[in-house]
Amino acid sequence: MRKYPFFYMNSFSCVPGYGNPAAVVYGAENISETDMQKIAKINGLSETAFIINEKTSGYDYRIKFFTPEKPINMCGHASIAAAYAYSEMNDMPCEISLTQKTDVGTLKIKVERLNEYSRASLQMDTPDIERTFHGQYKEFAQALGLKEEEIENDLPVAVNKKGYLYIPIKTIDSARRIKTNKELMLDMDKKLNLHGWYVFTPQVLLAENDFHVRFFAPSMGVDEDPVTGTANAYFSFYYYRYISAKPSGHLKNEQGFEIGKNGEIEVEFSELDA
């Protein structure tokens, strides 16, 4: 049986065991997608990334992502983990910029390997909002185990073009009391073509942060994701459209506290009005 280099990494935290874990398999050129899915299911993490080395001048490597249930086109925290693994396997400098090819295009990732921890950042486009819901919050609240009045009326519930649902709630107490109804969420996923539920409030646990976040993706086999890179990056467009009205800025969000995976993520956004 052939053996492959395997990495287990936590993104978005400097504390071991916190943040969002991802598995990375290096040199997966000869692993079939069927076997990739089996490996991801055995790992049981929200995502497993497979690095495929290809000789090309257009990018450094190709990557595929799998949840325990199905393949997905993109994953932020697993992209960061994969870039770090690639730099380690190829004995690259402590600071390096990489380009990875995904099923939805190429991503530019910067990796800084430091003594006590490492930093990584990736650049991506943010999808526009596709549709909004105003005052029609009963089913959303029921799916989260909340009362309808706990959802913020001054902001819309919105779905972007990638199928991410954004739900503003009033208080951090509501956020921490969420108890999802998985069956109802799955029904709404099918009805609205959703891929994930991003719930947020401006009330935070750590004063330096802007929003407290929780993210659920039951249709992807992820009951709750600890810290979600892609969803937080996409949130910047919602923030611009409905909260700040400024096309450039910075956000720092906290996530994962309810499941013991405390993490923080920073988002820089610009030219969202272009």
Map each language-model feature to its residues.
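Active-site proximal loop and beta-alpha junction motif in alpha/beta enzyme cores
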Residues: 1-74, 80-274
